[in-house]
């Protein structure tokens, strides 16, 4: 497989950041107001992107896919658990993204949500068929169009003389808002090494990927929050129609959905290869897209906050164990069947995260949970040092 340039990796993660799911999640921050909402978005993204960076660096240094790096901490069979959970979350994301895209486009051209689900699903399959290293000029044109259209969206929301409107709806605490901001980069954490491992300069590509994604993701959250605060409107498609964007709105909604969801489906295929050597990554990615399209047609997926918190509870303690092993303890358990100690520590971290959800902390739940998990790893190593293999 030919190597990807740092610029190509930046484009890939720009596409991941320009996402309807991120804009829609941003609308949830409106009750906090612009200042507190922006602070929560920034704090959450700094925390989440730091973890994403470390995960990408592990993959870049070792040349292994995301789920193969997990086996370095949890062993061959232990790593299969997380590969399976990752495939599940990616099938979920594929369905959610197709659902959101079809719902938004349906607000502009009302010909039935299921039709748009099929159109978006078909385009994702085309993206998969072309492949991540051969997208080249297609990605460049798409990203340029998305960039221009998001600037137009910013102008409509922030520079049209709109006054702030009263926000109704459920109250969101600052800590819960931080956690919603952490959740997006955290959801990409089990994927980033699938791309940095194929980079010409893995370390440079990882830094660029995370910085680009972090900046664009914050931007999308702010667009969503601003839309709710300044226009009182939570439906981005409606805002675009009111602004007279029409076909331009259709383009940005469809292609932002395709470029983001492609990454979910593609990485689901790569993770599936970790489950069984018999599985072909590209074919599995296409199968995931078909399943996601069917789910988007059949099931409502309007509120994804519970899904985001579930992702956090699974993958925050997982990456905490990896960080402790790779960067502090320098343990490599890739050759063992399963590392029972790390699996128990992960389970404690998972339970701790779920319990922390009942406590309102100013830094959310992920950071305290990760600190606890890393400390447990260090204590366990001190009590019973790992035998060199």
Positions of predicted regions on the chain:
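C-terminal membrane-solvent junction of multi-pass transporters and transport-like membrane proteins
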Residues: 3, 169, 320-389
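Juxtamembrane transmembrane-helix boundary signature
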Residues: 42-74, 81-87, 381-386
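Hydrophobic transmembrane alpha-helices that form the core helical bundles
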Residues: 78-113, 258-274
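Membrane-interface "cap" regions at the ends of multi-pass membrane proteins
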Residues: 1-36, 48, 134, 173-178, ...
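Extracellular loop-to-transmembrane helix junctions
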Residues: 27-57, 78, 213-215, 368, ...
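Membrane-water interface regions at transmembrane-helix termini and the short interhelical loops
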Residues: 27-31, 57, 96, 100-108, ...
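Membrane-interface loop-to-helix entry segments
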Residues: 115-157, 168-169, 206-213, 308-320, ...
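Transmembrane alpha-helical segments of multi-pass small-molecule transport proteins
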Residues: 12-17, 82-87, 108-131, 144-154, ...
């Amino acid at each position: 497989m030919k190597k990807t340039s740092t610029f190509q990796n930046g484009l890939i993660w720009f596409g991941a950041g320009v996402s309807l799911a991120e804009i829609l999640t941003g609308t949830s921050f409106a009750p906090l107001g612009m200042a507190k909402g922006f602070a929560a978005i920034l704090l959450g993204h700094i925390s989440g992107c730091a973890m994403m960076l470390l995960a990408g660096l592990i993959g870049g240094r070792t040349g292994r896919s995301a789920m193969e790096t997990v086996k370095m901490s949890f062993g061959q069979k232990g790593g299969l658990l997380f590969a399976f959970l990752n495939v599940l979350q990616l099938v979920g994301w594929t369905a959610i993204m197709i659902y959101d895209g079809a719902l938004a486009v349906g607000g502009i051209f009302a010909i039935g949500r299921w039709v748009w689900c099929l159109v978006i699903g078909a385009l994702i399959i085309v993206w998969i068929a072309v492949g991540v290293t051969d997208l080249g000029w297609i990605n460049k044109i798409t990203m340029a169009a998305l960039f221009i259209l998001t600037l137009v969206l910013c102008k409509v929301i922030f520079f049209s003389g709109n006054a702030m409107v009263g926000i109704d709806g459920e109250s969101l605490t600052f800590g819960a808002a931080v956690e919603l901001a952490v959740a997006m980069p955290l959801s990409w954490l089990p994927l980033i090494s699938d791309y940095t491992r194929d980079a010409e300069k893995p370390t440079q590509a990882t830094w660029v990927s995370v910085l680009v994604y972090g900046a664009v993701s914050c931007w999308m959250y702010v667009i969503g929050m601003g839309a709710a605060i300044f226009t009182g409107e939570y439906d981005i498609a409606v805002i675009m129609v009111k602004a007279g964007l029409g076909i331009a709105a259709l383009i940005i909604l469809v292609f932002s959905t395709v470029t983001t969801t492609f990454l979910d489906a593609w990485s689901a295929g790569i993770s599936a290869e970790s489950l069984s050597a018999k599985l072909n990554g590209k074919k599995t990615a296409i199968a995931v897209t078909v399943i996601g399209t069917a789910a988007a047609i059949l099931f409502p997926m309007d509120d994804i906050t519970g899904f985001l918190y579930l992702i956090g509870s699974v993958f925050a303690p997982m990456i905490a164990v990896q960080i402790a092993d790779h960067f502090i303890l320098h343990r490599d358990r890739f050759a063992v069947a399963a590392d029972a100690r790390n699996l128990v520590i992960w389970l404690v971290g998972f339970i701790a995260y779920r319990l922390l959800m009942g406590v309102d902390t100013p830094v959310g739940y992920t950071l305290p949970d990760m600190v606890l998990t890393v400390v447990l790893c260090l204590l366990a190593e001190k009590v019973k040092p790992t035998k060199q293999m």
